[in-house]
């Protein structure tokens, strides 16, 4: 499988995961917390990088650059998912207080303060509202971000032959 098709697959996975997030929000009625929003941005970043790589069809060094960008986007998302998993593991008396919604913060606070508040997480972020096979939503996003990092590493570290370049 060429790197171009790997990036295409990553884009489709990211688009599918974002569709699931919007389904959970608008159909199931789950309100996303600030860390959930940041994880969505991680998937958007990884998806955008992958779409650009798929459309560009890079060779050699270009694959490594796109692979690195994919790793950076997925790594940031994994860090945010890890933060939320940590908040969910805290005892009830150590959970931070609930904060305002993201929409409200965007209306009244500067962007930098919204980002700082979102990265800290709130009590909303510590609440487990849904599970599948024993994992909460940030658990599943951590699994998918880890998979994206592995695919980014694969694209970066694999050896490229002229035959691969012709199939891009």
Curated annotation (Swiss-Prot):
The chain crosses the membrane at residues 7-23, 42-58, 66-82, 140-158. It is a multi-pass membrane protein. GO terms for cellular component: plasma membrane. SUPFAM superfamilies: DsbB-like. Disulfide bonds join 33-36, 98-125. Pfam families: DsbB. Residues 1-6, 59-65, 159-168 are cytoplasmic. GO terms for biological process: protein folding. The keyword Membrane applies. GO terms for molecular function: electron transfer activity; protein-disulfide reductase activity. Required for disulfide bond formation in some periplasmic proteins. Acts by oxidizing the DsbA protein. This is Disulfide bond formation protein B. It comes from Marinobacter nauticus (strain ATCC 700491 / DSM 11845 / VT8).
């Amino acid at each position: 499988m060429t790197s171009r098709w790997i990036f295409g697959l990553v884009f489709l996975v990211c688009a599918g995961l974002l569709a699931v997030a919007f389904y959970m929000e608008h159909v199931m009625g789950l309100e996303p917390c600030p860390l959930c929003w940041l994880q969505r941005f991680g998937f958007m970043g990884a998806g955008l990088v992958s779409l650009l790589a798929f459309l560009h069809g890079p060779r050699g060094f270009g694959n490594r650059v796109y692979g690195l960008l994919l790793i950076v986007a997925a790594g940031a998302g994994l860090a945010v998912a890890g933060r939320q998993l940590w908040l969910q593991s805290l005892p009830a008396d150590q959970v931070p207080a609930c904060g305002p919604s993201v929409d409200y913060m965007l209306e009244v606070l500067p962007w930098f303060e919204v980002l700082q508040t979102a990265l800290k997480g709130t009590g909303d972020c510590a609440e487990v509202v849904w599970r599948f096979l024993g994992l909460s939503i940030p658990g599943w996003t951590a699994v998918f971000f880890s998979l994206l990092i592995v695919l980014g590493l694969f694209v970066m570290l694999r050896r490229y032959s002229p035959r691969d370049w012709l199939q891009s």
